């Protein structure tokens, strides 16, 4: 098993390395395999117990690291495992096609839906191509175009949020980054079709919110949602980005804390070790949640749907 272990997972990594070394010896020397099998089994049990212990007590900074894990599933992974007949749609019909934000029509258990999400990319070449998952205004305008298309054809909208934030470059600002985000917030609040938003990695500031207004907001267990990154917060408050762990704890960016504050609707449990450990399992859990959400929302008429969404949005910040 090839895994990219994070710093806090190093004790697990050391055990897994020992297990792999013993397996190599066992494969090379069949006469020793019987003796080694028992030792390998004991180490595997120890590794499992250690993983459970570490992941039962994660801090906010460790969750933030998991949300950014280089092997974490991205929107295209979920599209492949949850939906069928995906047909990508491109361009904002005004300036360009932003590769950081993707979308298209697909089927969820046979039901046509519009799927929209951030795509960070894997490997240097694709990360640059996808702008590290940070959309420009044309990306958000593309998303809005697809949402309006979905509304016209009465298709539910499902979004996957995973971005460090909207791209802050000069060109993006010149083309109206803040206006594009604000327009999406307003438009999504009034869409006459069900909208289900899912934070599957990083939920970074306005870049996440621009496709994050909906009837349901779900978060994966080890995803984050915040107005700024922990490093950015630490740089502002303490003038020291090394204080990011303290900032993460103070920001309340984890799914558990946001559920307590009633800012999200549900937490989708991840496989032990994180979503990247078992794509099939997390996809099945996410699909079950989407199907349940959609069944409930489609039972409402348009007026009930809009009133429910309005009340949900108005409850934010209420004490």
From Swiss-Prot:
Keyword Cell wall biogenesis/degradation: no
Keyword field: ATP-binding, Cytoplasm, Fatty acid biosynthesis, Fatty acid metabolism, Lipid biosynthesis, Lipid metabolism, Nucleotide-binding, Transferase
InterPro entries per record: Acetyl_CoA_COase_a_su (IPR001095), ClpP/crotonase-like_dom_sf (IPR029045), COA_CT_C (IPR011763)
Predominant location category: cytoplasm
GO cellular component terms, A-Z: acetyl-CoA carboxylase complex
GO BP, sorted A to Z: fatty acid biosynthetic process; malonyl-CoA biosynthetic process
Localization: Cytoplasm
Residue ranges the record marks as coiled coil: none
Lineage top rank: taxon: Bacteria
Enzyme Commission number: 2.1.3.15
Protein name: Acetyl-coenzyme A carboxylase carboxyl transferase subunit alpha
